[in-house]
């Protein structure tokens, strides 16, 4: 996971994000960085525990939103798609889960999961339920999956899908590697459209 997924318990903050940390020994640096991560986790749970509605039956959010059982039930969420390597299902007896174990790094291949994630979202909707797609912060990995879903299901361009998601969840910001994978998806969809237009 990268520092893009702020607050991630397993992400390592760069020294530059904590002014003056260079003067401490490695053990103290690690302790300070761990404390900063704990504070960020607590802030995420406090401030971001309600998912964002992207479209009918599709929500996007953070780990805190995925833990908020009462809100999820009130939104008719029946399925939860977790896009993170270190997060376990919070309520395995209450929701249908799919976990895609990936880290938020530019070299992570998230594109290989696009089709199965789209199928999972479609299945939840077919059954009359709703699905929450989340990672740790609901900023990069989960956003990438939701953008890919909108592109594949509605024929949106990358720009249209990303703008729509950002209008519903302003923190949305896939890492550069995920943007490249979405650009590849867009190109493959354009080639497919050209092929079938003959």
From Swiss-Prot:
Endoplasmic reticulum recorded as keyword: no
Q: What is the effect of changing residue 32 to R?
A: Impaired CaM binding and loss of phosphatase activity
Region: Disordered; residue ranges are: 1-20
Q: Does the keyword Hydrolase apply?
A: yes
Q: Which InterPro entries match?
A: Dual-sp_phosphatase_cat-dom, Prot-tyrosine_phosphatase-like, Tyr_Pase_dom, TYR_PHOSPHATASE_DUAL_dom
Question: Some GO term, biological process aspect, for this entry: which one?
Answer: protein dephosphorylation
Q: Where is the active site?
A: 135 (phosphocysteine intermediate)
Summarizing activity control, the record says:
Inhibited by sodium vanadate and sodium tungstate. NaF and spermifine repress specifically phosphoserine and phosphothreonine phosphatase activity.
The record gives the effect of mutating residue 135 to S as: Loss of phosphatase activity
Tyrosine-protein phosphatase domain spans which residues?
50-191
Give the residue ranges for region: CaM binding domain 1.
26-47
The annotated region (CaM binding domain 2) lies at 151-180
| UniProt cross-references to Gene3D superfamilies, sorted A to Z | Protein tyrosine phosphatase superfamily (3.90.190.10)
Write down the EC number.
Answer: 3.1.3.16, 3.1.3.48
Where would you find this protein in the cell? Nucleus; Cytoplasm
| Reaction it catalyzes | O-phospho-L-tyrosyl-[protein] + H2O = L-tyrosyl-[protein] + phosphate; O-phospho-L-seryl-[protein] + H2O = L-seryl-[protein] + phosphate; O-phospho-L-threonyl-[protein] + H2O = L-threonyl-[protein] + phosphate
One Gene Ontology term, aspect cellular component: cytoplasm
Provide the function of this protein.
Has a dual specificity toward Ser/Thr and Tyr-containing proteins. Dephosphorylates MPK4 in vitro.
PANTHER family to which the protein is assigned, alphabetical:
DUAL SPECIFICITY PROTEIN PHOSPHATASE, DUAL SPECIFICITY PROTEIN PHOSPHATASE 1
Q: Which family does it belong to?
A: Belongs to the protein-tyrosine phosphatase family. Non-receptor class dual specificity subfamily.
Query: What name is this protein filed under?
Result: Dual specificity protein phosphatase 1
